[in-house]
From Swiss-Prot:
Its EC number is 6.1.1.16. It catalyses: tRNA(Cys) + L-cysteine + ATP = L-cysteinyl-tRNA(Cys) + AMP + diphosphate. Belongs to the class-I aminoacyl-tRNA synthetase family. Binds 1 zinc ion per subunit. ATP binds at residue 273. Monomer. One of its GO terms (biological process) is cysteinyl-tRNA aminoacylation. SMART domains: DALR_2. HAMAP family: Cys_tRNA_synth (MF_00041). It is an enzyme of class 6 (ligase). This is Cysteine--tRNA ligase. Its cofactor is Zn(2+). GO terms for molecular function: ATP binding; cysteine-tRNA ligase activity; zinc ion binding.
Length: 471
């Protein structure tokens, strides 16, 4: 087990990670609101959770991880009523799409995916405890949290509530840090057909912020070692989670370490449907982009740095995967009978060094950029050793093992011996590429080119037309 340093948003500095039980690190991550397809900004946050999970396991920790499904909120209420469907009918296909997207980008399945609507009793219990402590008031049959009565409000976002006017409040789930007000815990129904529950705290439905506090309590009984989410959730959502949970259960530790992933930009700008730069995973795949390249790009920048998504960056990600895969394929051609039962025991000193440096990079607040530098340096050295025939079978198998070790985080490599394409398959792909170029579908054209290059096929434009040859 390797010591980890995480940047804790609560303290604003890197800290030694000290879970309650290293064999069962508890992690809660804010998941999707299932009213539409997740966009690639959401996907970056979900893949950050995947890298966190894979890294904890690789560094020797046991994990027990949760990502919630928000299946009741303002947007879902609005759209379900408009579509004349029940909440369950409306959210079911979007929930299914979320899991399909996770599978497409090779995200590992977590232990728990609770739905908000399955935790109503826990929400009611939290409200009742807050009421007993005088932290709740009622207005127009809805219940609100009085933040001025909670001494530690603002400790995560460092917000100053001293200038707040008493009794100002928000019914909406999302608002800006500059306009802090009391937030709603339980909403009375306002619209015809609005989903409601009949409970001891009244008829209505939960506010968004209450849902995560309740699901954490339902899954884990108390608090967690790590809570993650996008930086946009730090305020008000996570600040309000702290207020609710610590207000109701002041004797318990709610969250030890807060980790927040930064925004994703598209061509240097914030994603916006009006700007035409708003993409879902399915949009990108329909354009011919490789899901592995999308995954690689989204995990390749440190989670606390903004990531710029562009076609150039996708092409770069494809090239980087190809660089690693080509190295692996060279070894597999020499060792075609190797089985995929990797044991990760290394005897070669420089391979041991690669492993150690890779682990140390991840243990330093998931420094993926530094970890990737180790990967590419190892690929460079392996290729050099193969070029000069300086490796025997035992050593080559160890090279495969270290690439597999790296792929425990990357999740983009294929360890099956390369199957050569038939000539007819190559001709068919080249014809498809020509059609794509004619239609100015350059993303698909480039994807086919990359696929052929990965198979060792070079395309040449000649006066007589397109020719291809094997490297």
């Amino acid at each position: 087990m390797i010591e980890i340093q995480f940047y804790n948003s609560l303290s604003g500095r890197k800290e030694k990670f000290s879970p309650s039980d290293p064999n069962r690190v508890t992690v809660y991550s804010c998941g999707p609101t299932v009213y539409n397809f997740a966009h690639i900004g959401n996907l970056r946050a979900f893949l950050f959770v995947d890298v966190l999970r894979r890294s904890l396991k690789l560094l020797g920790y046991g994990v027990d991880m949760t990502m919630n499904i928000t299946d009741i909120d303002d947007k879902i209420i609005r759209d379900s009523i408009a579509s004349k469907k029940s909440i369950i009918e409306f959210t079911a296909p979007w929930t299914k799409a979320f899991f399909e997207d996770l599978k497409t980008v090779s995200a590992e399945i977590l232990e728990h995916y609770p739905k908000a609507t399955d935790s109503i009793p826990e929400m009611v219990d939290i409200i009742q405890k807050l009421q007993k402590k005088g932290l709740v008031y009622e207005k127009d049959e809805s219940l609100y949290f009085s933040i001025q009565k909670f001494q530690n409000y603002g400790k995560l976002s460092k917000i100053d509530t001293s200038g707040m006017k008493t009794g100002t409040r928000y019914d909406t789930d999302e608002y800006e840090k500059e306009d802090v007000r009391d937030f709603v815990l339980w909403k009375s129904p306002k619209l015809e057909g609005e989903t409601s529950w009949y409970t001891l705290v009244g008829t209505g439905r939960p506010g968004w912020h209450l849902e995560c506090s309740a699901m954490i309590r339902k899954v884990y009984g108390s608090g967690v070692d790590i809570h993650t989410g996008g930086v946009d959730l730090l305020f008000p959502h996570h600040e309000n989670e702290i207020a609710q949970s610590e207000g109701a259960f002041p004797e318990e530790s709610f969250v030890k370490t807060w980790l927040h992933s930064e925004h994703l930009l598209v061509d240097g700008q914030k994603m916006s449907k009006s700007k035409g730069n708003f993409y879902t995973l399915r949009d990108l795949i329909q354009q011919g982009l490789d899901p592995k390249a999308i995954r690689f790009l989204l995990i390749s920048t440190h989670y606390r740095s903004k990531l710029n998504f562009s076609t150039d960056r996708i092409a770069e990600a494809s090239a980087n995967i190809r660089k690693i895969q080509n190295c692996l394929d060279r070894i597999l051609e020499l060792e075609p009978d190797i089985k995929a039962d990797f044991y990760f025991l290394f005897s070669i000193p420089f391979v041991q060094t690669w492993k150690k440096e890779f682990e140390e990079s991840l243990a330093d607040d998931l420094n993926i950029s530094k970890a990737l530098a180790v990967v590419f340096e190892s690929v460079k050295q392996i290729n050099s050793l193969l070029d000069t025939n300086q490796s025997d079978s035992k050593q080559r198998i160890e090279y495969i093992q270290i690439l597999a070790y790296f792929d425990r985080i990357l999740g983009v490599l294929n360890f099956e011996s390369k199957k050569d394409l038939l000539d007819s398959e190559i001709d068919s792909l080249i014809e498809e590429r020509q059609i794509a170029r004619k239609n100015k579908d350059f993303a698909r054209s480039d994807a086919i080119r990359d696929q052929l290059l990965a198979q060792g096929i070079l395309i040449e434009d000649t006066k007589e037309g397109i020719r291809w040859r094997k490297k």
